[in-house]
């Protein structure tokens, strides 16, 4: 079965990898193709679309055709006894095309409603290629606004925003009921997103005030999780006890509480390797290149996001 993912433009590397990691964990990927913001996935398995952060829409593909063949496709595509409309992305004159294709459906007995459709026929135009199908999922962007860091009871500056936090949790491939660790949890951005997806979150921080505040934030969102006082360099966890790790490293060159960052990275790398299950992933955010510290891991992805003039985040996906 083919699905087309219309990806967020925020970061295509993250968007593509997020889809592929989850698809591999929930089912079987037969094939996939990238074309700018489009990802065509031949997939069989459980649907995971509600988890996605960096995908705007998912459409179940009916046909792939040229622009000149669109009317023929819409003369054959199934119609249903429910309100429907046609929505087009890409190409020129999309409003006129939506009306023309909607009229073809109406002539075939479809109930057309632009304002309140129950079924949406999607057409994505890329050059002369058209992807035609039925909309399966559309991301509600309000959820991220409602969960932004400044709306939490416990606040800290520079907290990771919910959209990126959810994407990085997804990059680890952790499923419902499995355990995700954030060993430098701060206000709990990763833990919140993990908990809302049915994942068991464990957070650790070395400052007692932050541990208490993070617990308050989890309780605010109705999330059951463990937040412990501890040191990321010496994790109070058993070997191979977590399925994934997502964390945001401190950005200063050194910190009084944690020692030098070189020490922090070298020791946390050892601890990540110890507590991660074999094949488990760690999604980490940092402001320095860390390949030398994680030489025992496979680097599946490295990308960058500019935060402001003096800060560019590096985002790594590491596999044990």
From Swiss-Prot:
Signal peptide: none annotated. GO terms for molecular function: tRNA (guanine(10)-N2)-dimethyltransferase activity; tRNA (guanine(10)-N2)-methyltransferase activity; tRNA binding. Transmembrane segments: none annotated. Its EC number is 2.1.1.213. Residues 46-136 form the THUMP domain. It is found in: Cytoplasm. Pfam families: UPF0020. PROSITE patterns: THUMP, UPF0020. Catalyzes the adenosylmethionine-dependent methylation of the exocyclic amino group (N(2)) of guanosine at position 10 of various tRNAs. Acts via a two-step process that leads to the formation of either N(2)-monomethyl (m(2)G) or N(2)-dimethylguanosine (m(2)(2)G). Belongs to the methyltransferase superfamily. Trm-G10 family. Monomer. This is tRNA (guanine(10)-N2)-dimethyltransferase. It comes from Archaeoglobus fulgidus (strain ATCC 49558 / DSM 4304 / JCM 9628 / NBRC 100126 / VC-16).
């Amino acid at each position: 079965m083919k699905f087309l993912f219309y990806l967020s433009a925020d970061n295509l590397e993250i968007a593509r990898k997020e889809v592929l990691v989850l698809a591999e964990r929930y089912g079987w990927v037969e094939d996939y193709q990238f074309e700018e913001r489009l990802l065509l996935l031949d997939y069989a398995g459980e649907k995971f679309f509600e988890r996605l952060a960096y995908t705007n829409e998912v459409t179940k593909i009916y046909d792939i055709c040229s622009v000149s063949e669109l009317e023929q496709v819409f003369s054959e595509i199934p119609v249903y006894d429910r309100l429907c409309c046609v929505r087009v992305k890409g190409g020129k004159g999309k409003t006129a095309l939506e009306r023309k294709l909607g009229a073809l459906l109406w002539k075939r007995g479809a109930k057309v409603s632009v304002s309140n459709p129950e079924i949406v026929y999607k057409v994505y135009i890329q050059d002369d290629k058209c992807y035609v199908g039925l909309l399966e999922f559309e991301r509600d962007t309000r959820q991220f606004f409602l969960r932004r860091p400044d709306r939490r009871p416990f606040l800290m500056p520079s907290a990771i925003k919910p959209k990126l936090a959810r994407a990085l949790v997804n990059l680890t491939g952790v499923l419902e009921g499995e355990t995700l660790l954030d060993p430098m949890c701060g206000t709990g951005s990763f833990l919140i997103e993990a908990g809302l997806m049915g994942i068991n979150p464990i957070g650790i921080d070395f400052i007692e005030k932050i541990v208490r505040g993070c617990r308050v934030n989890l309780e605010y969102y109705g999330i059951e999780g463990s937040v412990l006082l501890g040191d990321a360099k010496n994790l109070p966890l058993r070997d191979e006890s977590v399925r994934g790790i997502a964390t945001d490293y401190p950005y200063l060159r050194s910190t009084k509480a944690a020692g030098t960052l070189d020490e922090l990275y070298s020791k946390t790398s050892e601890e990540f390797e110890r507590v991660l299950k074999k094949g488990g992933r760690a999604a980490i955010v940092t402001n320095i290149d860390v390949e030398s510290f994680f030489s025992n891991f496979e680097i599946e992805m490295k990308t960058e996001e500019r935060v402001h003039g003096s800060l560019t985040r590096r985002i790594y996906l590491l596999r044990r």
